[in-house]
Amino acid sequence: EAMIGRIIVDPSESFLAGSVEDEIIFKSYQQFKKPNEGLRIGLLASNQNLYSNRRIIEAAEQRGHEIEFYNIRQCFMKLDATTPQIHYRGGKAIELLDAVIPRIRPAQTFYACALLRLFESLGVFCLNNSDSIIQSRDKLFSLQLLLKQGVQIPTTGFASSPLDTNDLIKMVGGSPLIVKLLEGTQGKGVVLAETKKAAESVINAFKSLNANILVQEFIKEADGKDLRCFVIDGKVVAAMQRTAPPGEFRANVHLGGTTSIIRATAEERKLAIKATKAMGLRVAGVDIIRSAYGPLVLEVNSSPGLEGIEGATQKDIAQMMIKAIEKQCNYAPKGV
């Protein structure tokens, strides 16, 4: 009768089963759902709308995978001997993931890496593992690891007491010099001290706040430029040059630096790969500066942004990251 218009069926008024929870509906229709033939990937990050995260989600879906975004702050864990689990706010335990892509802000390193360790113990492949991320985030430790593997860096000084300030300045060749906060990111907390007096003032000011700092030689011949080499699975897949805006020495894109495509030399590519391996990372953005005595590594970034490098090179870096996961998981996509 309803089919020919004689009876009106209003689900909100006439639904005999009453209100049905989403979980019951999901179970009822699960048998009719076409099984997903791709991998199940989790993107562990903070902001789904950032360019890098949107591109990763897009690339995974284009290659036939199911990808879920998990906000780091909304994950919580259960630790026990039999059924350790990671839960997501408002839902059940996160299960059956093949891989996790971590995109971690420095301020969330501690908690996010705790989540990653549990994923790793549950047999989930993490594109960058927790240990590698932790050591790459420690500026002093990462420089020590680089030197241990024979990777060249700018001459760097570190001291605990303000009483050693003068010796620290001499150690790196005097002024001008760079003062870096160990906790700084994206060029923040980096100061160029052009005179010895300015260097003393900056160092002592940071020390009075109990801040940990590094002092580094200033590479004048770099002329406000550096290279970002993007490394995936032991290969430099793209490289760009970053140029600081007028009146600035920092070339970070977040501070107004511009990007352009550049061909890294064989020596620079080798250095970037070596630096990435020293950190134990599969995916990294390696920042290199050209000096009078050869290329030097400034930093190894475990969550490198994609917007600058994809824009400068027109390469699909996000898809390369997904392919690296497929390779590790022995997955061969169909029709892609």
Question: What residue spans do the PLM features occupy?
Answer:
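Conserved hydrophobic helix-helix packing surfaces used for dimerization/oligomerization
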Residues: 7, 41-42, 177
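Short hydrophobic segments within beta-strands
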Residues: 10, 44-46, 232
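ATP-binding N-terminal substructure of ATP-dependent carboxylate-amine bond-forming enzymes
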Residues: 29-127, 132, 141
